Amino acid sequence: ILRKDSPCYVPKVMVEVPHIIDIIHKAGGLAVMAHPKLVTSDEYVVEMLVYDFDGMEVYHTKHNDDDVKRYKALAKEHNLFITGGSDYHGIPGKAPDQFGDYLVSAENVSEFISLL
């Protein structure tokens, strides 16, 4: 579906951040800023935090210990819950190789569940 040569390919549509966050919230969801290190720059991440995000993906395969500290502090400063992800896509030979390679604390999971 994501590849242009796929028979089911659907082109991406660019949507403004406030609009997509509104859609997520109206659907009862929580808007999370995903893998901030992979965004343009930390300055841009901070600029994006003017929007009504609920959480931030602090733990990610591309985040080192310094990144985790920095994003954890940003999440706390902006009252965002902390989440994490492995970015596992099931592609052989591409890290992470399996579920469970990257974990978040039970406290972070409990906080997330309490917000649902």
Give names to the regions the model predicted:
Residues 18-22, 26-33, 37-116:
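Charged catalytic cores and adjacent phosphate/nucleic-acid-binding surfaces used
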Residues 1-16, 20:
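Active-site-proximal loop/helix segment associated with metal-binding centers of metalloenzymes
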